[in-house]
Design a protein with these regions (language model features):
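Feature activates predominantly on carbohydrate-active enzymes
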Residues: 139-312, 320-330, 346, 496
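Active-site beta-loop-alpha junctions enriched in small/polar residues
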Residues: 201, 230-234, 273-279, 336-340, ...
Length: 540
C-alpha cells in the first residue's frame, strides 16, 4: 500500500544537517528523483563530515547500541535510499516516505553497490513473502537493526513495521545529533500494545485533529488508537443501518476509512469501541423502549434492558455494520458501569433481568451471569465478523459467576474504584491477558471531575510501569511480564467536553504520551533525568 500523503515536510533538524553537509562540499545538486532501477551507480565522494556523537538520542530510547570507530552517518543531498528487493517490496512505501522526510532523497530499486552516504533498507530472510503492512503478532515483528558503518547506513528488520520503526529512530537521531553515530542499534519494544484511547463520543474531534494524533503516535512508535465513539452523549460515526442514532456532529464513514488507511500505512491499528450494555444513551434516545427501568419505573441513563431480544439485535446490527470499517482485527466491547450492577439490590430492583438470567442459564443464575453472557454473545458477533483480539473493561468481569467470560478476551484494566472492582492480580491468576489503562496515571479527563487531576508526563516517567495496573503499586513482577500485561494506553475522556479545546487537549497530552512511549518500549529505569528527557522530547 502506498500512502499518498506522507508524514511530514523536512524538519528543522534534517534541514540543518543537509545545510552543514552542503557547506562541507558533500551535498551535490540537482532535483531529487523518485527512483531508478538497474543503473550503474556513479562515483560518489566519500563524505568528510565531523563524527556523529553517540549514543543515539531518541524517544523512546533504543534498547542496545554497540559503538564503533568511525564518522557515523549524516543525511546528504547526494545520498540515496536503496531498496535491494525492488519497487514491489513491502518496504517500498517506507523507503519513499523516508526519502522525502530526509529532504527529498532519490530512491533506487534493485541490487546495486551501496555508495558512501547511502541508506539501504532491507527485510531479513524471515520477512520474505510477507504482505505490505501485514499485522504484527509480537514484539519480534517490530524489531530492527540500524548499522552505521563506513559512512553508509543499513536498516534491517523482519517486517516493514520494523523498518518503519528503524526510520523513526534515524529521523529522531538526525534531529537530535545531526545523524547516526558509528555502530549498531539493536532495538525492539518491551510491550506489544502501545497506544492512545480517545473519547470522541462526549466531545467531537474533527478528522484532521485525529489524523494529526495518529501521526504523532507513529513518530513515537506507539501502535494503537482506540476510538470510543458511542456513549450516552452521542454516537459519532455515520450509520446506514441506524441513522436515527447518529449525532449531528459526527465523522463520515469516508473520513473514518481515510483515518484507518493513514493509520495502517503508519503501522497504527485503530481499535473501535461500541460500549454495551451500559453507556448507550445515544442509541436509547432513539429507542426508548429498550431503556432499562427499575421495578418502581425509574429509568437508568445509558443502560439497556438486556432482557429484551431487541437489545441484542440493535447492538449486533451496529457491530456487524462497523466491523468492515475497522479491519485491524481488534475490538473493544466496553462492558463497564452497567447501572443495574451498581445497585445494592439488583435482583430486587430489576426483576426482569433476574428472571431473564434464570430462564437462560438456570435457577441459580444471577444478573452478573446475564451480563457476562451478554458480552460473550457480543464477543461471538465480532469474532464472526473477523475480529481476533477482543477486550472489555475490567468491571465487565465478575467473580464467581456460573457463566464464564470468554477465556480469550483481554481485560482492559482501568480502575479499582467501581463497586465490586477486583484486584488486577485476580485476572492474572486466571491466566487472562491484561492491557493497562490505570486511571491513576493514564486518564486525562476533561474538567478534572471526581478528584481526577490531569496526569503529567513527569509522574508517568518517574513512577509508573506497565505492572502498575491499579493505584500506585505494581503487581508481582512474576505475573506482569510482556506475555501477561500486553501493554498500555493513555486515555482521554471528555466528561466535561467544553473545558478544553482540541488544541489544549493536544498540548496537554503531548508529554504524557512521550513518557508512556518510553515506559512501554524499554523496561529499564530511564537513563535520563526528567528535565533532560523533556529537552530531548522537544528536539526530536
Amino acid at each position: 500500500m502506498r500512502t499518498g500523503k506522507l508524514t511530514a515536510t523536512v524538519t528543522a533538524g534534517v534541514t540543518a544537517a543537509l545545510t552543514a553537509l552542503a557547506v562541507a562540499g558533500c551535498s551535490g545538486g540537482g532535483t531529487p528523483q523518485r527512483g531508478e532501477s538497474g543503473r550503474s551507480p556513479s562515483a560518489a565522494p566519500t563524505p568528510t563530515w565531523d563524527p556523529v556523537q553517540g549514543p543515539p538520542r531518541t524517544v523512546p530510547a533504543v534498547q542496545k547500541f554497540s559503538a564503533a570507530d568511525g564518522r557515523g552517518w549524516r543525511p546528504g543531498k547526494q545520498a540515496r535510499v536503496v531498496v535491494p528487493a525492488g519497487e514491489k517490496s513491502p518496504v517500498a512505501d517506507e523507503a519513499e516516505r523516508f526519502a522525502r522526510e530526509l529532504g527529498g532523497l532519490r530512491t533506487v530499486w534493485g541490487k546495486q553497490t551501496v555508495r558512501p552516504g547511502d541508506v539501504e533498507l532491507k527485510l531479513s530472510d524471515d520477512g520474505a513473502g510477507r504482505a505490505d503492512n501485514a499485522p504484527v503478532y509480537d514484539t519480534a515483528d517490530e524489531a530492527y537493526t540500524v548499522t552505521a558503518r563506513g559512512t553508509r547506513l543499513t536498516l534491517t528488520a523482519p517486517t516493514d513495521a520494523g523498518i518503519f520503526n528503524a526510520t523513526r529512530t534515524v529521523l529522531q537521531s538526525v534531529r537530535a545529533s545531526g545523524g547516526v553515530p558509528e555502530g549498531t542499534i539493536e532495538d525492539r519494544p518491551d510491550r506489544a500494545q502501545r497506544g492512545f484511547m480517545l473519547d470522541i463520543a462526549r466531545k467531537h474531534f474533527d478528522a484532521r485533529w485525529i489524523e494529526d494524533r495518529i501521526r504523532d503516535l507513529a513518530g513515537l512508535k506507539l501502535n494503537q488508537l482506540q476510538l470510543h465513539f458511542s456513549d450516552d452523549q452521542a454516537f459519532r460515526i455515520e450509520s446506514e443501518k441506524h441513522p436515527e442514532i447518529v449525532s449531528a456532529d459526527h465523522l463520515t464513514k469516508d473520513q473514518v476509512r481515510h483515518l484507518v488507511e493513514v493509520a495502517r500505512g503508519l503501522h497504527v491499528t485503530v481499535i473501535p469501541e461500541i460500549d454495551s450494555p451500559g453507556h448507550l444513551g445515544a442509541v436509547l434516545k432513539a429507542h426508548p423502549d429498550l431503556q432499562l427501568r427499575s421495578a418502581d419505573g425509574r429509568t437508568e441513563r445509558g443502560a439497556m434492558d438486556i432482557s429484551q431480544p431487541g437489545a441484542a439485535e440493535i447492538v449486533d446490527d451496529l457491530l456487524r455494520e462497523f466491523a468492515p470499517l475497522f479491519p485491524g482485527k481488534h475490538w473493544h466491547l466496553g462492558g463497564d458501569e452497567y447501572r443495574a450492577l451498581a445497585d445494592r439490590a439488583p435482583a430486587e430492583n430489576y426483576p426482569q433481568l433476574a428472571r431473564a438470567a434464570r430462564e437462560k442459564y438456570g435457577d441459580g443464575a444471577t444478573i452478573e451471569d446475564l451480563a457476562t453472557g451478554w458480552l460473550n454473545d457480543r464477543d461471538k458477533t465480532v469474532r464472526a465478523a473477523g475480529a481476533q483480539h477482543v477486550e472489555a473493561w475490567n468491571d465487565g468481569y465478575f467473580p464467581d459467576t456460573d457463566v464464564e467470560p470468554d477465556p480469550h478476551r483481554t481485560v482492559a484494566y482501568w480502575t479499582g474504584k467501581e463497586i465490586g472492582a477486583r484486584e488486577p492480580a485476580e485476572y492474572l491468576r486466571e491466566n487472562r491477558k491484561v492491557v493497562n489503562l490505570n486511571d491513576e496515571y493514564l486518564y486525562y479527563v476533561l474538567g478534572e471531575p471526581n478528584n481526577m487531576p490531569y496526569p503529567t508526563g513527569e509522574r508517568i516517567y518517574k513512577q509508573w510501569t506497565p505492572g502498575v495496573l491499579r493505584g500506585t503499586q505494581p503487581v508481582p513482577e512474576s505475573s506482569s511480564g510482556p506475555d501477561r500485561v500486553l501493554g498500555a494506553r493513555f486515555a482521554v475522556w471528555c466528561d466535561l467536553a467544553g473545558e478544553q479545546t482540541q488544541q489544549q487537549v493536544a498540548d496537554g497530552i503531548r508529554m504524557p504520551l512521550r513518557a508512556l512511549a518510553q515506559k512501554v518500549w524499554d523496561r529499564r529505569e530511564p537513563a535520563l533525568s526528567w528535565e533532560d528527557f523533556k529537552k530531548l522530547a522537544n528536539q526530536v
